[in-house]
Regions:
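Short beta-alpha connecting loops at secondary-structure transitions
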Residues: 9-13
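NAD(P)-dependent Rossmann-like dehydrogenase/reductase catalytic/cofactor-binding core
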Residues: 20-23, 27-42, 60-65, 70-141
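Conserved short loop/turn motifs at secondary-structure junctions
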Residues: 43-47
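Amphipathic, non-transmembrane alpha-helical scaffold segments
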Residues: 18, 22, 48-52
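N-terminal alpha-helical segment
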Residues: 4-8, 55-56
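Short, residue-level hotspots on alpha-helical faces of the histone-fold
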Residues: 50-57, 79
Length: 141
């Protein structure tokens, strides 16, 4: 999800961001960088991660509960929702340690259970199974 790769930029306005600065930044991102821009306020996760993190954690919880296998969770999302990859493969790509870090930050700010990292994720990170970057996560690389 680095900015150079994705077509989206989240334009975050703080309490002190002027309308002129936000408008100039949006114009630059759109016209010069060719990005689609969404505006949001300054909160953990902005828009994308506020939606993405609970989704990824829900997939981990499904596997942890024995509801479905890793492969079946990912297959269901790819085939059933037309996503380019499943949530567990995406978690491996992001890095399970990174996912945990983001989830912890969001949970600390909002205290909402949907942001709480599941025990399986904690155990995998503690074991060094961080996903693609370590060669092992939900999948072997």
């Amino acid at each position: 999800n680095p900015v150079p790769v994705l077509p989206l930029v989240e334009l975050v306005s703080t309490l002190v961001t002027s309308d002129a600065a936000a408008a100039a930044t949006e114009q630059f991102a759109s016209a010069v960088l060719g990005k689609q821009v969404v505006r949001c306020s300054d909160r953990s996760g902005f828009v994308v991660n506020a939606l993405l993190v609970p989704y990824l954690l829900a997939a981990v919880r499904m596997v942890e509960a024995g509801f479905a296998t890793v492969a079946d969770v990912d297959k269901a999302v790819v085939a059933g929702l037309s996503h380019p990859m499943g949530p567990l493969r995406l978690s491996d790509l992001v890095g399970l340690d990174t996912l945990k870090l983001i989830a912890d930050k969001m949970y600390d700010e909002f205290k909402e259970p949907l942001y709480a990292a599941p025990p399986l994720l904690l155990r995998m990170v503690e074991a060094g199974r961080l996903g693609k970057k370590s060669g092992q996560g939900f999948y072997s690389y």
